[in-house]
């Protein structure tokens, strides 16, 4: 009865899963018996699941759920490309996937953490906030990631992108604990990062002799999938949650009947993450060789069949980022990523190059890491963008617009004049790609004007301006005397002042002809001195 009372009070024990790169619980899990009730106990399995929804009592809630940003602060359009500093493609690809993670980006753009953080230099959250803000607010540009992002990880050679990804996520999680170093493991799992990326595994062992049940819960930040025998992500997930028989040498030592007996072990997801990171195990742990096979993955993924409660309705996730490795080994090759901007358009992020893509191209890659977000979360962020972004400080929008326009002018001297209308700048920065933005500029640029009649008032009285017909053949056929007169006049020697005026007008006429070379209806001007 002692076990029963512990169970009813919800006092469960957990094993802290410290190695983030290996997310599947296995035999290394300590088997913690939370109950010794047989199968026919009044407390059924379903009842036990409902009772432990909160998993464990939390001494301190480090990031209350209500503090998560509820609406989007992200610009609708795609942001900046990232400069490769030398074998840093794995850094760039990982950072782009994190930058376009809606809950994380919204929190970073709210600047909530930096306003209360007292150790900005060594804080990964502050460093990521600065990076994400720069990347999203500089569309069409290429920025250089801060060296602090890979400090302690990058050693001048290419590393594994997934390892760097989880190194960054773990560092952000630790940055949530500067003033809470003495908190228990359960409270550490209430950080903002765990609320975004984290969930709990449930490893259940059922004794086939006495029907006693032992449950182990462990937190996760990503899920590793074995693809050796899987042709799709769904097949890999099915293999992950497939019951395993424990018998013979692997028989289970039951804590209820105190015997070694056959048992059934089942691994399921007990709580779901807002953002799901699925890692396809493409590289051998020994040789590093790559499993270069196509594994299908869907745009929408229902995770409900793999949960502890499989019959509670669909739990749909939508794809928003894909990290790809091109090459034959984890020691070489190239990393790039595909991300879905807030506007819904897919983009290929290949270091400094940012190009529009399609969902067909995205789903045809040999993916290494897949990023999914709960459909309800994505729709909520998308709806907030369609309604308009949150109010900002007075004048902040105009300041950002002028800054963006000034940067574009410095980078592109040909765009220095004239300035665009405000509504065109707004549309370009929020809804258009860089190419579309340049197209709009060219369409709305004021064309150079040259009207010879405006010059006539400045000419000396002894200079005559004659407008030749655009139909040369007409003058030649019907007015030969005018053609001859023009030739004679043009061959005469002008005075010094006339020569200066003639040269000036000829130069102006040349520029006008070049600027209007595509206008078939423009008239030619011929200067004749009397």
Swiss-Prot record:
Source organism, top-level taxon: Eukaryota
Biased composition annotated in UniProt, kind: Basic residues: 510-524
Outcome following mutation: residue 89 to S: Abolishes enzymatic activity. Loss of the pro-apoptotic function
Catalytic activity entry: Thiol-dependent hydrolysis of ester, thioester, amide, peptide and isopeptide bonds formed by the C-terminal Gly of ubiquitin (a 76-residue protein attached to proteins as an intracellular targeting signal)
Tissue specificity: Expressed in heart, brain, liver and skeletal muscle.
Function noted in UniProt: Deubiquitinating enzyme that removes conjugated ubiquitin from specific proteins to regulate different cellular processes that may include cell proliferation, progression through the cell cycle, apoptosis, cell migration, and the cellular response to viral infection.
Protein name per UniProt: Ubiquitin carboxyl-terminal hydrolase 17-like protein 24
Gene source species: Homo sapiens
